[in-house]
C-alpha cells in the first residue's frame, strides 16, 4: 500500500526484530519490494543473536541489506556493527556510499570485538542463547498464569524468543511503575519501560 502511494520511494526500511522483540514478515515484504523494484533494508540492530535461536537472517529471508548491531545482543564492544548484504545492491555502490556513514579509520579494537563475538556465538553462545530462550518461554508462561500482566507471545506476533515483553495494559500499574517495583523489590532492572 505504501509503495503504491509513494512510487518515488527508492527503498523500504523496516526494523526486525523491533525493541519489543516483534519480527516482521521479511519474506513477504521482500516480495512486495522487489515487485516494485525497490530494495528492502532491515534495521536488525537487536537481532545479532537470532541465528543462534534458529531464526534466519533478514538476508536469508530476502532482504537486500541488514544492519546488525553486534554490541546490542552479542558480547561486542559498544558501537560495533556489521552490514549484511544479499549482493543485489552492487558492492561498488556500498563502497561509494560508505563514507556517508563510516570512517576512513576503522577501529581494529571494534573489529576484533566483532570477531570475538562471532566466535563466541558459534561456540558457547549458541548454548547460552538456547538456555535464554527456554527461560524466557518459561517466564512468559508463569507471568501469564500467575499475574495480571500480559506478555507478548508467539500466538500474538512472531517474536524473538529471547526477548521478554510485559504489557501493563488493563492494569493499574504503568510500565515505569512496574520497572521500579522490579528494581526495588526483586533487583531486576528492566531494559526499557514505557
Locate the predicted segments by residue:
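Conserved C-terminal alpha-helix-loop-beta "cap" of PLP-dependent enzymes
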Residues: 138-194
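Conserved PLP-enzyme active-site core in the AAT-like
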Residues: 1-153, 172
Amino acid at each position: 500500500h505504501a509503495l503504491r502511494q509513494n512510487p518515488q520511494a527508492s527503498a523500504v526500511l523496516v526494523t526486525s526484530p523491533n525493541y519489543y522483540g516483534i519480527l516482521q514478515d521479511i519474506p513477504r515484504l521482500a516480495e512486495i519490494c522487489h515487485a516494485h523494484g525497490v530494495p528492502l533494508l532491515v534495521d536488525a540492530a537487536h537481532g545479532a543473536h537470532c541465528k543462534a535461536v534458529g531464526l534466519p537472517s533478514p538476508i536469508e529471508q530476502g532482504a537486500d541489506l541488514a544492519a546488525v548491531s553486534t554490541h546490542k545482543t552479542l558480547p561486542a564492544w559498544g558501537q560495533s556493527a556489521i552490514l549484511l548484504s544479499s549482493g543485489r545492491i552492487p558492492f561498488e555502490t556500498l563502497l561509494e556510499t560508505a563514507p556517508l556513514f563510516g570512517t576512513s579509520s576503522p577501529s581494529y579494537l571494534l573489529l576484533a570485538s566483532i570477531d570475538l563475538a562471532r566466535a563466541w556465538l558459534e561456540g558457547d553462545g549458541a548454548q547460552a542463547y538456547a538456555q535464554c530462550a527456554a527461560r524466557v518461554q518459561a517466564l512468559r508462561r508463569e507471568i501469564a498464569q500467575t499475574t495480571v500482566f500480559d506478555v507478548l507471545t508467539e500466538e500474538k506476533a512472531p517474536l524473538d524468543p529471547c526477548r521478554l515483553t510485559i504489557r501493563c495494559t488493563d492494569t493499574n500499574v504503568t510500565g515505569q511503575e512496574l520497572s521500579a517495583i522490579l528494581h526495588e523489590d526483586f533487583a531486576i532492572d528492566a531494559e526499557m519501560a514505557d
